[in-house]
Regions:
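Helical element adjacent to the flavin cofactor pocket in flavoenzyme catalytic cores
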Residues: 1-39
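Short glycine/threonine-rich loop-to-helix capping motif typified by GTGT followed
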Residues: 35-37, 69, 168-171, 203-216
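A glycine-rich dinucleotide-binding beta-alpha-beta segment and adjacent secondary-structure elements
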Residues: 130-136, 191-216
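Conserved FAD/dinucleotide-binding core of flavoprotein oxidoreductases
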Residues: 61-66, 149-180
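Mid-domain catalytic core of redox enzymes
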Residues: 27-149
Length: 216
């Protein structure tokens, strides 16, 4: 079946069939505009591409503050200065496989904290990393066994966290949150999880900023 990766593959095939040129492994360093029209993209290796229209499928604040040259006023909300703009939550993503199968775990599982309003307040307003959390657990092998070797499972966990306007040290808290999530999943719905885990990794809001150019 393939999931999102298969969707990207088929979209690529479609673009190729209709004659769209796809350039990979080239990071856009800047986009230049003239008379309020963006017309040129410059890559990190100095290549220049000229266009009639440019569509940026990323975080708009990053585009206007870091990529568009010369810099213009805040085009997202011209009235508010950047310092007064509000941003959504950050995200912690935990990826892991297991050398067994948890057949009672569905393809999609929502794992909720006992708190609701207080948890959201900590994340969005106070920008504190709470001791508790709510999770989305994804098990694609529930419907597509090709996502893992025979007899194994593949997972990722999404955990809402404060964005980078917080003072959280993710070099420390990343491992702490990873361990807390695993402990809670093992305690509640995935017995003996720690002894079954293989190929564990995670992403913090810093990774989303560095790898995907999110603003916060």
């Amino acid at each position: 079946m393939g999931g999102t990766g298969k969707l990207v593959e088929e979209l690529t095939n479609l673009l190729n069939r209709v004659g769209v040129r796809i350039c990979l492994n080239e990071d856009i360093k800047s986009v230049e505009h003239k008379n309020s029209i963006a017309y040129k993209a410059i890559t990190s290796n100095g290549k220049e591409y000229f266009f009639d229209n440019i569509i940026f499928n990323g975080d708009p604040p990053t585009f206007y503050s870091e990529i568009l040259k010369p810099k213009k006023r805040n085009l997202i909300n011209p009235i508010l200065p950047d310092s007064l703009m509000t941003y959504s939550m950050g995200l912690f993503v935990l990826f892991f496989g297991t050398n067994n199968q948890y057949k009672d775990i569905a393809h999609h599982t929502i794992w909720l904290s006992k708190r609701f309003k207080g948890l959201l307040n900590d994340i969005f307003k106070e920008k504190d990393l709470p001791d508790d959390f709510s999770l989305y657990l994804h098990r694609p092998t529930a419907t597509d066994q090709t996502f893992a070797p025979e007899g194994c499972d593949s997972y990722y966990v999404l955990c809402p966290v404060p964005n980078l306007r917080s003072s959280i040290n993710w070099k420390v808290e990343g491992d702490n949150l990873k361990n807390n999530i695993i402990n809670e999943l093992e305690r509640t719905i995935m017995p003996n999880l720690k002894s079954k885990i293989k190929d564990l990794s995670y992403m913090t809001p810093i990774d989303f900023k560095n790898d995907y150019r999110s603003m916060h």
